[in-house]
Amino acid sequence: MTAFRILSISAHGALEMLLGLLALVAPFALGFGLAGAVVTILLGVVLVGLALSTTDSGVRLSAHYAMDYGLAVGAAAAAVIIGLAGDRAALLFLIGLALSQLALNVSTRYSTRG
């Protein structure tokens, strides 16, 4: 399983920052409804915060690991709820965000070593 964990925690943080910034811009660029925009912006803010926490030694890596998986599950749940509300663009974006976060989680070495 560790053979697939090719990203260092710093690379993980950089990619997480990119995902967060993308989530902050997407509602305006893709024309989400109000609920989809609010949820996506909130997830973007959380992602940026998580990305910034990778450079701070005050946050344990095990806590960051748990928050990453929580965010992926939360984004998937939000996608379902927003999809039921009828916002197809936000649904597709949030599913992509959840899958991207999950792929990032699976490919990251949650270790300070190398």
Language model features with spans:
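Extracellular/lumenal glycan-associated surfaces
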Residues: 8, 12-32, 44-54, 68-85, ...
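Residue-identity detector for threonine
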Residues: 2, 40, 54-55, 108, ...
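Short, aromatic-rich membrane-interface segments at the entry and exit
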Residues: 33-41, 87-94
